[in-house]
Amino acid sequence: MAKKTPLYEEHVALGAKLVDFAGWMMPLQYESIVSEVEAVRKNVAVFDVSHMGEILISGADTAMFLDWLLTNSFSALNVGQAVYSVMCNEKGGIIDDLIAYRIADNEALLVVNAANTQKDFDWIKLQSKEFNVQVDDLSDEYGLIAVQGPKSESLLSSVVQEVSSLKYYHFAEFTIFNKKMHGE
């Protein structure tokens, strides 16, 4: 049976056409794909991407491990920065692309593609054996939304004023509706 995101009931109430995507019941469309594409290009759209995988890496060797595991430098990031990167196998073939967030000096959150979450987790866990890190799959503990389109900042700023001060590939923690959120 497919998993349901924290927003599943909202999708149903709003009349979404739901499909199984990577083991998750996800909205394919609401009224029409054309109007939704128009919204993203000219206005703003909110996407439920809670099906994405979230893998926490923690421990003294976090930065060293991720520098070894990913194609981009993780150790160059300050807390509050993120990097889009690729995770490769021993022959240089791509396992997955992901975003790595430096949430503390010795802590990182990797957001991986939904269809690859278990495969990625297993690979990361296997590769971590020589490093002083802990690897945890937190995918079932996170809800994730993406806000996209030219009016995204305007919409988000109406709820969280600090959003406008974020730089490219930076994030911060905010409280929205009494819930702690991370904004990128």
Language-model-derived ranges and their functions:
Residues 1-184:
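Basic, glycine/lysine-rich polyanion-binding surfaces/domains
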